[in-house]
C-alpha cells in the first residue's frame, strides 16, 4: 500500500486504498464516501436492510467523510483572496522543494498546477479545505469537492507536494 505524505509537514494525507487518479499531471484525485462512525464501529455505507427500513444513527454515532476521518484532516477556511495568497506561497515552497529534489519535474508542476488552480478559483464556492493533522500553515491544504452527480465527494492533493511511502 502507498501512503501519500506531505513533503513539508510529514502528515499522511491519502493512500492508494482509495481509487487515486492523476489529473492535469499535477493533482491526485480520489473519490471518497460519507460513513457512519461511533461506538467503535464504522458503517461503510451499505444499504440498510429491507426489514429495518431506514437505519437511524445510534447514540454517539456521526456521519463523516472517510478520507477526512481516516487521515485526521482538520477543516480550515479560506475566502478567495486568502486562498490565492496561500496557494501562491505554497507553490513557491513546492517549486523550491522540486528544484532541490527533482529539478526535471518543475516545468510539469508549474503547468499542471496553474491549470488546476484556475479550476479551483473558477468554482471556489464549491470547495472545502482541510489541513493535515499537524495543522502546519505552510503545508498542503487538501481540497474537497463533489463530482458532477452532486453526491460523490472527492479529495484532491498536489502530486508534487507529496512523497509516496510504501508500507
Swiss-Prot record:
Could you name the domain of life of the organism this protein comes from? Answer: Eukaryota
Using the record, list the residue span of the signal peptide; answer none if the entry has no such feature.
none
List the molecular function annotations (GO) for this entry: calcium ion binding
Against InterPro entries, the record matches this protein to: Mss4-like_sf, Mss4/transl-control_tumour, TCTP, Translation_control_tumour_CS, Translational_control_tumour_p
Entry annotated with the keyword Cytoplasm: yes
| Keyword Cytoplasm belongs to the record | yes
Report the GO terms under cellular component. Answer: cytoplasm; cytosol; fungal biofilm matrix; microtubule; mitochondrion
The name on file for this protein is: Translationally-controlled tumor protein homolog
| Source organism | Candida albicans (strain SC5314 / ATCC MYA-2876)
Taxonomic path: Eukaryota, Fungi, Dikarya, Ascomycota, Saccharomycotina
Amino acid at each position: 500500500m502507498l501512503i501519500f505524505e506531505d513533503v513539508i509537514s510529514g502528515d499522511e494525507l491519502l493512500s492508494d486504498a482509495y481509487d487515486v487518479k492523476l489529473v492535469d499531471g499535477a493533482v491526485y484525485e480520489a473519490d471518497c464516501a460519507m460513513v457512519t462512525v461511533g461506538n467503535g464501529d464504522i458503517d461503510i455505507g451499505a444499504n440498510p436492510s429491507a426489514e429495518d427500513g431506514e437505519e437511524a444513527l445510534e447514540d454517539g454515532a456521526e456521519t463523516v467523510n472517510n478520507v477526512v476521518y481516516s487521515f485526521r484532516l482538520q477543516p480550515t477556511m479560506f475566502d478567495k483572496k486568502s486562498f490565492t495568497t496561500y496557494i501562491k506561497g505554497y507553490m513557491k515552497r513546492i517549486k523550491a522543494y522540486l528544484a532541490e529534489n527533482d529539478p526535471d519535474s518543475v516545468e510539469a508542476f508549474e503547468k499542471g498546477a496553474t491549470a488546476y488552480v484556475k479550476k479551483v478559483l473558477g468554482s471556489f464556492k464549491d470547495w472545502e479545505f482541510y489541513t493535515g493533522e499537524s495543522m502546519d500553515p505552510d503545508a498542503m491544504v487538501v481540497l474537497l469537492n463533489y463530482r458532477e452527480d452532486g453526491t460523490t465527494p472527492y479529495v484532491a492533493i498536489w502530486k508534487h507536494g507529496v512523497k509516496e511511502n510504501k508500507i
